[in-house]
């Protein structure tokens, strides 16, 4: 999922938010997920079958709206000889704008940033967006390690998918009943073998997780007994991986069952991670504002200038940012001017500063999308900040929804 851009994730989140707010009067909003290997002709046939079955809907208005939505889907399918590389997602339905009779047909058709896994046709009073949510979750990678003295399993968690990377066994001997010097000598052998096993686990953890360190959101460690604590407290893993440990869990099992147990026991921690990640970046930004380093910037103009210079390490965008970039072009002399307007503000009329001709709007783009594109061009990390935290609200209200953490001080 590392090839999925910040812009794509931002657009999916934005679309998700829009779709979740849509509600039909009855079970008349249609959602279709088409995997890339699915034949368009097969989908079109099923849509025609659904169109026929919809004649049995008792409510005249619901029947009419469902049939209209399916007909729109059938027409849109004709534009695709085959599904795009990652499949196709379609949301179609009549959305009420007020009282009865105010319904308007709304259509969303797009290729998701990650391949559609399962063909789905869904008709309800709300759009079926759960698979889209999983696409966003899939970008978030967690490392999971479960261990005791006898074995260890290393895995990754992406969304709801668990991938087992490595299973190791130790060969560490069990308890020995001999007494005296033999016992002490044997205990030393056991401790040395256990130490070597932890070193071996550490090497495999580094091999598995270091290539993912930029996208790795956290590491979960679990297992029965104290071995997991010895592993965490010792210098067995690379510091960049160690710094990402977010939870240590007592489990009853190792192996695959232990991995699932660690994940289940870490549910609350995982839920908190997005918020903690946002808080971390916002605190770094706020610290930069008041420190002598001066490694913080905010405001649309300043952040854009720093992005164009390649000086921004992390771009912070509020999910509540509601503005657009309007590009004006003079039809007489081709002079170009770009301004920012509020989301629902009527764009003003502009005259060319050179020839006084009325300029035409030739491009409209959300400010967030434009800044994210700039960020990707210069390899700047992007964090879309929610307004669910005090820091997120502060970014939105006090800093205009746009801020940056700089790579170096700009004079």
UniProtKB/Swiss-Prot annotation:
Organism (species): Methanosphaera stadtmanae (strain ATCC 43021 / DSM 3091 / JCM 11832 / MCB-3)
Keyword field contains Protein biosynthesis: yes
SMART domains noted in UniProt: eRF1_1
The protein's name: Peptide chain release factor subunit 1
Record keyword Cytoplasm present: yes
GO molecular function: translation release factor activity, codon specific
Pfam families (alphabetical): eRF1_1, eRF1_2, eRF1_3
Gene name of the record: prf1
Keywords: Cytoplasm, Protein biosynthesis
GO cellular component: cytoplasm
Cell location: Cytoplasm
Family named by the database record: Belongs to the eukaryotic release factor 1 family.
Protein purpose: Directs the termination of nascent peptide synthesis (translation) in response to the termination codons UAA, UAG and UGA.
Subunit and partners: Heterodimer of two subunits, one of which binds GTP.
């Amino acid at each position: 999922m590392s090839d999925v851009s910040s812009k794509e994730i931002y657009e999916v989140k934005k679309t998700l938010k829009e779709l979740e707010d849509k509600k039909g009067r009855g079970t008349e909003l249609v959602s279709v997920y088409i995997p890339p290997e699915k034949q368009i002709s097969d989908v079109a046939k099923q849509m025609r079958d659904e169109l026929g079955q919809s004649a049995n809907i008792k409510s005249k208005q619901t029947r009419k709206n469902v049939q209209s939505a399916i007909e729109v889907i059938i027409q849109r399918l004709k534009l695709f000889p085959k599904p795009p590389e990652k499949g196709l997602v379609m949301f179609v339905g009549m959305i009420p704008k007020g009282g009865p009779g105010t319904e308007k047909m709304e259509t969303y058709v797009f290729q998701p940033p990650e391949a559609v896994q399962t063909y789905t046709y869904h008709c309800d009073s709300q759009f079926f967006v759960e698979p889209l949510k999983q696409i966003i979750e899939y970008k978030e990678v967690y490392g999971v390690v479960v261990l005791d003295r006898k074995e260890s399993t290393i895995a990754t968690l992406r969304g709801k998918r668990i991938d087992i990377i490595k299973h190791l066994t130790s060969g560490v001997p069990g308890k020995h009943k001999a007494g005296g010097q033999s016992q002490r000598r044997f205990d030393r052998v056991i401790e040395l073998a256990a130490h070597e096993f932890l070193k071996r686990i550490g090497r495999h953890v580094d091999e598995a997780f270091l290539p993912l360190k930029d996208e790795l959101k956290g590491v979960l460690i679990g297992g029965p007994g104290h071995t997991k604590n010895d592993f965490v407290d010792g210098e067995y893993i690379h510091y960049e991986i160690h710094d990402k440990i977010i939870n240590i869990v007592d489990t009853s099992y190792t192996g695959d069952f232990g991995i699932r147990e660690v994940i289940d026991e870490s549910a609350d921690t995982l839920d908190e991670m997005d918020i903690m990640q946002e808080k971390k970046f916002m605190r770094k930004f706020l610290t930069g504002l008041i420190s002598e380093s001066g490694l913080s910037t905010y405001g649309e103009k300043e952040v854009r200038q720093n992005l164009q210079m390649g000086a921004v390490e992390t771009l912070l965008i509020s999910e509540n940012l509601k503005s657009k970039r309007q590009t004006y072009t003079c039809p007489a002399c081709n002079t170009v001017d770009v301004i920012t307007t509020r989301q629902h503000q009527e764009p003003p009329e502009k005259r060319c500063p050179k020839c006084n001709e009325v300029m035409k709007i030739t491009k409209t783009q959300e400010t967030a999308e434009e800044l994210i594109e700039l960020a990707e061009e210069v390899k700047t990390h992007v964090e879309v900040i929610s307004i669910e935290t005090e820091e997120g609200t502060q970014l939105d209200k006090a800093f205009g929804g746009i801020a940056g953490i700089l790579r170096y001080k700009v004079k």
